[in-house]
C-alpha cells in the first residue's frame, strides 16, 4: 500500500511539472455494469448489475487524480437444505481516489491506465431458518481496497470527452469473505 501511494505521489509531482494548458477540474458520470464476486470457505457467489459512479477530479494534462463514489448492486444468495433455509444479502458502496495516466496519441482518442485506493462500506444481512430455530444477523463494516483501471477517452471538444473503461477492485475481506468487483462502464467527462 505504501509503495503504491509513493509511486502515485512521485508520478503526480513529475507530471505536474510537465503539464500543458489542458489542465483543469472535471466531473464525470459513468453508467456501469459490474460483477460482484465473493469467495469464502463455503464457496463462491456472484451477482451482476447496474453500478453508477460519480467522479470529480483534476486533469494535469496527461495525468489525472479523481475522487469517486460507486454504488453496487445488492449481492443476494439463497441456500436451502433439507431442514433449513439461509438468505444472505450484501450491500456495498465505495468511495475512492484514482490516479490515472492518459496516453497522448496527438488525436482525440486517449487510452488510459490507473490505480485506485478505496474505502468500502459493507452491509451484510443473514436470515437463517430451520424447523425449530430462526436467527438473523446484521454486520456493518468498513474496509479498504485497491484496484486497477484501464480504458479509452474520446475528446468530443476541448472540455468534453466520452469515456469507456474497465475496473477491477479488490473491495476487501470481512469475516473470511473476500469481495471483488469487475466493472465495465461508459460515461461523460466535463472539464472546467
What annotation goes with each model-predicted range?
Residues 29-33, 67-71, 113-119, 152, ...:
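Transmembrane beta-barrel strands of outer-membrane/channel proteins
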Residues 18-63, 189-191:
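Short glycine/proline- and aromatic-enriched beta-strand/turn motifs that initiate or cap beta-hairpins
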Residues 23-25, 46-52, 59-61, 91-95, ...:
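Residues that define the transmembrane beta-barrel architecture of outer-membrane proteins
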